[in-house]
């Protein structure tokens, strides 16, 4: 579908709109009731690696707008699902989501109290607000991943899993090295729903050693 350029609409916004209109995952999300196309990234990764199977406690870091949380609620009925995001997330049945900056000092304590036990899975689709400078964006997002990993190491039950978004840029191998010390299996994957022109990838760490 082609999009006509409005006089005051930027070329980049036209490209974004055209991409959205032509994206089968956007159409599928609208049709199936998911809040974002990102839901399919989690679905695809879980279908291949099964990290949500049997999960009873799951944490979703960077939950807005709620696509990943929706998937977890569907695949893990009855599980304790807690999420956090700086942006407010509309209620999702079966999940408790707090509006708070995950990087805030009190966030970790709040999440641990809400979990009321060790987590089976910690998910992080967090990414820093983009600046337009690729290396800066990479470093800022990797700082979020490092904090998410530190949290996961504290709350995961033995044999638990950690799944996080990373941006390619040179330093992601360092965090993979750290993960390999704590998990039996660590993979670097790009699900089909991740746009080919995006630098994002996901790390899937399974078999937490405790």
Where do the language-model regions lie?
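A short glycine-rich, Lys/Arg-flanked "PGG" loop and its adjoining helix->strand segment in the class I
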Residues: 142-158
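Conserved SAM-binding loop of SAM-dependent methyltransferases across substrates and taxa
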Residues: 65-77
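Short glycine-dipeptide loop
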Residues: 77-79, 156-161
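Class I SAM-dependent methyltransferase Rossmann-like catalytic core
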Residues: 1-56
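Conserved class I S-adenosyl-L-methionine
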Residues: 54-64
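Class I S-adenosyl-L-methionine
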Residues: 168-210
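S-adenosyl-L-methionine
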Residues: 86-131
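Glycine-rich helix-loop-beta junction characteristic of Rossmann-like nucleotide cofactor-binding loops
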Residues: 47-53, 115-116, 154-155
């Amino acid at each position: 579908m082609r999009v006509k350029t409005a006089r005051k609409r930027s070329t980049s916004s036209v490209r974004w709109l055209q991409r959205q209109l032509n994206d089968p995952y956007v159409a599928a999300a609208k049709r199936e009731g998911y809040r974002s196309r990102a839901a399919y990234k989690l679905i695809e990764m879980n279908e291949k690696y099964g990290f949500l199977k049997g999960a009873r406690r799951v944490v979703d870091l960077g939950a807005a707008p709620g696509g990943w949380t929706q998937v977890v609620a569907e695949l893990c009925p009855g599980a304790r699902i807690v999420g956090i995001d700086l942006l407010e997330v509309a209620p999702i049945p079966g999940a408790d989501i707090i509006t708070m900056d995950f990087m805030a000092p009190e966030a970790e304590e709040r999440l641990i109290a809400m979990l009321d036990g060790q987590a089976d899975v910690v998910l992080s689709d967090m990414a820093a607000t983009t600046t337009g400078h690729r290396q800066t964006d990479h470093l800022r997002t990797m700082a979020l991943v490092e904090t998410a990993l530190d949290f996961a190491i504290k709350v995961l039950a033995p044999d638990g899993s950690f799944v996080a978004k990373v941006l390619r840029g040179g330093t992601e191998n360092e965090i993979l090295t750290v993960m390999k010390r704590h998990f039996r299996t660590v993979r670097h994957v790009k699900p089909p729903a991740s746009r080919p022109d995006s630098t994002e990838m996901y790390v899937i760490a399974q078999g937490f050693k405790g």
